[in-house]
């Protein structure tokens, strides 16, 4: 049977030929315009931009300082009214001075309280910051189970049961030496010179010299 025919006997269409890219296609792809990479800024341009940014920042700081001075002047003008001293006698001037001193003392007390609060807050912030740094450098401690201390005998008893006593009796296999045997051995060892003299016949000669 012909391979180009299917089971019904009809002719199947021939597959499309595989087209390969020629060298011309590759050359065309290479010459196509692609997205250009950004150019690097030169050192002189960077220096110029930094100088410009510093100038702008300096102008902003000067403007903010001028605004703060203006706000301070307006606050002082509203709180501290100009004094009217015309037509005041000596006693009235003394009363006015006492009132001004009292106001100054009150303002100093308030300023001291505010400074104390600010110092306390700064100290607390520094302590909290240090605690944060300490916590970052530590590992989180896992929750441990309750530890129950148990002796070695109790542990072996729980593991081995009745065999624990036999296992833990380590001195059972050691050699037992009685005290009497030890004294006898010491006594025998201490008389070794006398035994040698008796065996060699030197005991009588020693008595002659001693006499």
From Swiss-Prot:
Residues 129-150 are annotated as: Involved in binding TNC and actin. The record marks 80, 97 as: Involved in TNI-TNT interactions. The keyword RNA-binding does not apply. SUPFAM superfamilies: Troponin coil-coiled subunits (SSF90250). It holds the Pfam family Troponin. Phosphorylated at Ser-22 and Ser-23 by PRKD1; phosphorylation reduces myofilament calcium sensitivity. Phosphorylated preferentially at Thr-31. Phosphorylation by STK4/MST1 alters its binding affinity to TNNC1 (cardiac Tn-C) and TNNT2 (cardiac Tn-T). Phosphorylated at Ser-42 and Ser-44 by PRKCE; phosphorylation increases myocardium contractile dysfunction. Ser-22 is one of three sites in the region of residues 1-48 that are phosphorylated by phosphorylase kinase. Keywords: Acetylation, Actin-binding, Metal-binding, Muscle protein, Phosphoprotein. InterPro entries: Troponin, Troponin-I_N, Troponin_I, Troponin_sf. The modification Phosphotyrosine is found at residue 26. The modification Phosphoserine is found at residues 4, 22-23, 42, 44, 77, 151, 200. GO terms for biological process: cardiac muscle contraction; skeletal muscle contraction. Residues 32-79 are annotated as: Involved in binding TNC. The modification Phosphothreonine is found at residues 31, 51, 78, 129, 143, 182. Interacts with TRIM63. Binds to actin and tropomyosin. Interacts with STK4/MST1. Belongs to the troponin I family. Troponin I is the inhibitory subunit of troponin, the thin filament regulatory complex which confers calcium-sensitivity to striated muscle actomyosin ATPase activity. This is Troponin I, cardiac muscle. The gene is TNNI3.
